[in-house]
Amino acid sequence: MLYFFGNSRFFLFFFYFFFYFVLVIKSSVGKNEYVSPDELNIKTSGFLGYKCDFSTEGIHNLEPDIVERRSVICSINSYFIYDKIKLIIPKQDDPKSKFKLLPENCFAKVYSDIEGKTEIPIEQTGLIEYTLEENDTNQDYSERIIQISPFNNKDIEFYCICDNTEQVISHIDGRSALVHVTVLKYPHKIVSVNLTDQKYPYLFDAYNKNDFINYKLEIGLKEGELLVLACKQIDNKCFQKNDESKNGDLYKTNKIIYHKDFAIFKAPIYVKSNNATAECKCKIDEANIYTLVVKPDYDEKVIYGCNFSKDLSFRTFTNNMNLLKYNENTNINCNVEISQPFYDHLIGISCPGTIIPDCFFQIYKPLTNELKSSEITYLDSQLNIGNIEYYEDIHGNNEIRIFSIVGAIPQSASFTCMCKMDKITGFMNIKIGSAYYAFLSKLFIIFIPLFFMWL
């Protein structure tokens, strides 16, 4: 009897162990979960794009200012990959508000020619694949949002006007503002793969199922090129994972956009190695699952920034300042200044210690005076753009942070990041100029009063 129970206990133990082992193996191997690109967009996307914030507390607010009476310009000059422009305006149903938006239903209608005061529906501008949205849930302001695709075949320009010039406080007038949007034609090649039955007239020379060999297709991309996959059901890590047969890898912060039936991959400006890949699976049905592998080109671009390490083997930095050469309790300043009307740059820091703050997502605003500490803010809000790509790397004992900007920035900006190693601190002070918008704003200051006199 004891022998039987002893064997029974052994048998039960073996059974439970085997059952647990099978569950672990099954869960680790598991099947891919497939979702629509739109579902994945809801799970992964925040706000990507640009803001013109004319609300009372906004960066472009038009409240009366005795010191600063100039008109305000909010300019956007960029290509778009389903990025958004968010126009934030005071509630217009407030009887005390003198704020006017022209045209009233901007962005549904816009000015195509500010000099001719030509008001047209947005569909007549030539935009391809865009969406409009309004959000009135906030009690203090409303939001007008336009989301723009990369498929325009020409540069497109349009305007809206925000007017708060009536006398709102005694004899002091409020201010006016120009919203100036230039949607650039996407500057790089767009490669498309259509695995749906739908025709998209703006996807030219698209690959299809016949181009796959054994359900697999690999496509090489040059820097900045887009790959647009049209598919109804994609795996839930689409383009976020590597081709497992290769050692290279890409970064989680690459530009990957999910929109309607599209999964879009932008070849990054910074690639870690020459065998980096990313893949996406498209499920037609249980028997037909296609794997698309993208392989970005590898190019060693110069990094505008500061290498505080003695190691010069990782890429080329414009400034090299080895912290180990300095005495303790020393602060080292590394200054980097760039001024271009159009950017295609990598900006970065290499640090053998700790990078402070969480650069480049977070950065220090420049010091306003010696008695006040720098404030921490977000890089996209400091530059007032949303089209930024962030990269991280480790090389030996050095932590490397990099970001890239492509296009123009609305206004010049400065910020600081720190590299702290024991009792030595390196300060990277970055200044990014905006030559184009400095010239444009001067024209606007002269022109906008004439415009309102003419209205």
UniProtKB/Swiss-Prot annotation:
Task: Tell me which residues are glycosylated.
Answer: N135, N194, N275, N307
**Could you tell me which residue ranges the 6-Cys domain spans?**
48-186, 302-433
Its main localization is other
Q: Does the keyword Repeat apply?
A: yes
**Pfam entry (one):** s48_45
Q: Identify the keywords attached in UniProt to this record, alphabetized.
A: Cell membrane, Disulfide bond, Glycoprotein, GPI-anchor, Lipoprotein, Malaria, Membrane, Repeat, Signal
Where are the GPI-anchor amidated glycine lipid anchors?
A: G433
**Could you tell me where this protein is found in the cell?**
Cell surface; Cell membrane
A GO cellular component annotation here is:
side of membrane
For this UniProt entry, which residues form the secretion signal?
1-30
- Membrane topology recorded in Swiss-Prot or TrEMBL: Lipid-anchor; GPI-anchor
Kindly state the subunit structure of this protein.
Heterodimer; heterodimerizes with PF230.
Name of the protein: Gametocyte surface protein P45/48
Q: Which gene encodes it?
A: PB45/48
